[in-house]
């Protein structure tokens, strides 16, 4: 957590509570709460699967230890009954540095922008690793017509989860 007067200085990380809660919309009563085992994984951006059955959550690692941060996953999935982290292959996770940016879901699966890795981490709808789609300084993700769009430094990608995404250079 940060405070407005400190800018982006992080404080009280030991009090983090990485969880999803379900509240009664009329009374505010707590109906359920699901926690991640690793309390230093911050739940960030959210996207529903196209069938609205699963919630994808981009994660940001807040570990003091850089080794733990570099090994951290960037995607969690919540199916209404369980919250689980989705592993990222170790050799890829080290380049991501535990930082998931934007989040999107398409019929092809999940996407998490990873600007520190200059790419988009992609997963199947079930959460299995697909690959890292290269795009320098990628951050914003959007879905249009079932296809993933991604914005990065110098270009945007159309249908970014395809075998051959279409690049749209900026300023061209």
Which functions belong to the PLM regions below?
Residues 1-16, 58-72:
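Short, conserved, GDST-rich strand-edge loop motifs in beta-rich repeat architectures
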Residues 10-26, 71-80:
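Beta-propeller blade signature
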Residues 34-39, 87-96, 131-136:
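Surface loop/turn motifs at the tips and blade-to-blade linkers of beta-strand repeat domains
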Residues 40-47, 95-103, 136-145, 168-172:
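Repeated scaffold domains used in trafficking and secretory/extracellular systems
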Residues 51-53, 107-108, 145-146:
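Short coil/turn segments that connect the beta-strands within blades of beta-propeller domains
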Residues 57-58, 112, 150:
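Residue position within the beta-strands of beta-propeller blades
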Residues 88-125, 138-139:
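Loop/turn-rich, solvent-exposed surfaces of beta-rich toroidal or solenoidal domains
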Residues 151-172:
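Blade-level signature of beta-propeller repeat domains, shared across WD40, Kelch, NHL, RCC1
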């Amino acid at each position: 957590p940060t405070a407005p007067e400190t800018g982006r200085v992080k404080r009280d990380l030991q009090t983090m509570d990485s969880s999803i809660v379900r509240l009664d919309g009329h009374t505010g009563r707590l109906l359920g709460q699901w926690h991640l085992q690793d309390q230093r994984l911050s739940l960030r951006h959210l996207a529903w699967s196209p069938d609205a059955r699963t919630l994808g959550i981009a994660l940001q690692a807040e570990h003091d230890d850089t080794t733990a941060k570099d090994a951290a996953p960037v995607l969690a999935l919540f199916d209404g009954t369980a919250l689980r982290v989705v592993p990222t292959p170790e050799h890829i996770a080290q380049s991501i540095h535990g930082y998931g940016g934007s989040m999107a879901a398409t019929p092809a699966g999940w996407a998490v922008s990873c600007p520190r890795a200059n790419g988009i981490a992609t997963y199947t709808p079930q959460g299995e690793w697909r690959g890292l789609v290269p795009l320098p300084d990628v951050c914003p993700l959007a879905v249009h017509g079932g296809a993933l769009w991604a914005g990065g430094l110098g270009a945007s990608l159309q249908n970014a989860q395809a075998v051959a995404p279409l690049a749209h250079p900026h300023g061209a």
